């Protein structure tokens, strides 16, 4: 299990999530608890790049840690759900793994998305604007282009690993519609 913490890409830490990982460890799962660069250190797409690098590290070191690289499940909540989705969905052609080059196939067996952001651009303006997303994008003139590059909806296609989305309809932080739109697009793609 590869777990990615939430926090709006600007807060949270892997240490804050340790207790929620204990049930998996008790069941004998190998768990990788991922830390990524937050917005105060590096703007988007750094967090996505870091998570792809973490996946590459897990695959490269799978034998040493007795991990079956064909059974990696990636999960996270909120911004971590977004990062779990991008980690499992982004194709190599997106070029978001340039921070950790290699020839490993960065694929996962499944994605569990706990109320993750699926359309970053939707959070940069309009009725769904969220300060955490604006902070993560910064004032870069191409922030809408970057938002599209890091949005899971951009990468919906046939052949993705199974994706389970869990999202409550009263979520004040991540619009419920994000989960609905992802499911609709995944259904269309097959």
Predicted region positions:
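Alpha/beta-hydrolase superfamily serine-hydrolase fold, recognizing
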Residues: 1-190
